[in-house]
Amino acid sequence: MNDLPVYLFVGFMGAGKTRFIQEILADADFCTSDKVLLLICEGSESDYNPSLFLHDNVVMHCVKNERDLTPEYLSTLEEKHNPKRIIVEYNGAWWLPAIYSAMPKHWFVFQNLCIANSIEFPLNAVAMPDLSSDKLEDADIVLFNRCQDSTKKHVLQAFVRKVNTDG
């Protein structure tokens, strides 16, 4: 089997993952005619507007339960849809090791993007420090949205640097 790149989008509910994914699937710089499997682990297919996708090559599949994330289940989806790349909108309440251990061996995380609401992130980091750190540890890119003039960017940057030692 060929290696399959996985674009992993992590962050808490309301952070803007769905909108970001919707926009990249409408972007000619990202999209090709290759089939994409979009695994939606938070929300539902109705959160997306396929008519805005650049191509009609996106297959959406909802994963409602973390227990469903198994190598067998994901392999079945791959065999059924034969994608060339995979996008995962990951549930912010689920721990990342669940998806890492569930990915078939030939799947690899090509890019891990953490999207965070700059207004809610400090509250989440205090209320759920381990879960917040889990989302940041392996992130290749951390995007803070909804920033305002009053946003204390240095506080957000300090938290990311503390947790994500590779960045």
Predicted regions and their residues:
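Arginine/glycine-rich "motif VI" loop of SF2 helicases in the C-terminal RecA-like domain
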Residues: W107, K135, T165
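G-domain G4 guanine-recognition motif of GTPases
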Residues: G11-F12, C41-E42, I115-I119, A139-F159, ...
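Long, charged, low-complexity intrinsically disordered regions
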Residues: N2-V6, V160-G167
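Flexible active-site lid/hinge loop adjacent to a nucleotide/diphosphate
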Residues: F121-L136
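Short, aromatic/basic amphipathic alpha-helical patches
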Residues: N49-D56, H154-V163
